[in-house]
């Protein structure tokens, strides 16, 4: 079964709760639920897979996410909800759609090989989107616009 997410907004749930339910495709990966505090200061985030460093602004909202327990293959925070009550999922495996890749090709990580070459960081991958987007958005519209602003 492919990755599937069900989002229920506060106006659709019986008690006003925001609910997110999600499954992952592929092999079993243990997940955990984390609550990240709000952060006032700017910081940087380094992606595990593509080795890209991204500057993050201050005023990050408090949010939850569900990353893999092991970070060896990337963080993969599959879903989360922020303090503005915006829910997000991002790892719906965009890699399998050739039309998307044709319109927006990957910027692939290139490892340093030898003394005369440099490491070339890759682009932002689906495994980093929740971390880079969710703490900074107040609506679904902002969630669509933020990745393009990165």
Put a short name on every predicted segment.
Residues 128-129, 138:
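Intrinsically disordered, low-complexity acidic segments that are enriched in bulky aromatics
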Residues 136-142:
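Short, charged, surface-exposed loops that flank catalytic or proteolytic processing sites
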Residues 1-126, 146-150:
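A contiguous strand-loop segment
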């Amino acid at each position: 079964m492919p990755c599937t997410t069900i989002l229920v907004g506060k106006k659709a749930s019986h008690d006003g709760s925001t609910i997110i339910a999600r499954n992952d495709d592929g092999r079993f990966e243990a997940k955990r639920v984390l609550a990240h505090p709000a952060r006032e200061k700017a910081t940087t985030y380094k992606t595990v897979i593509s080795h890209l460093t991204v500057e993050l602004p201050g005023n990050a909202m408090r949010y939850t996410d569900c990353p893999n327990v092991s970070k060896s293959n990337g963080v993969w925070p599959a879903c989360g909800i922020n303090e503005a009550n915006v829910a997000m999922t991002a790892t719906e495996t965009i890699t399998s759609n050739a039309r998307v890749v044709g319109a927006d090709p990957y910027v692939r990580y290139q490892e340093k090989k030898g003394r005369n070459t440099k490491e070339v960081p890759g682009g932002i991958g689906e495994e980093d989107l929740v971390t880079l987007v969710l703490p900074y958005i107040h609506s679904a519209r902002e969630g669509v616009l933020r990745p393009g602003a990165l």
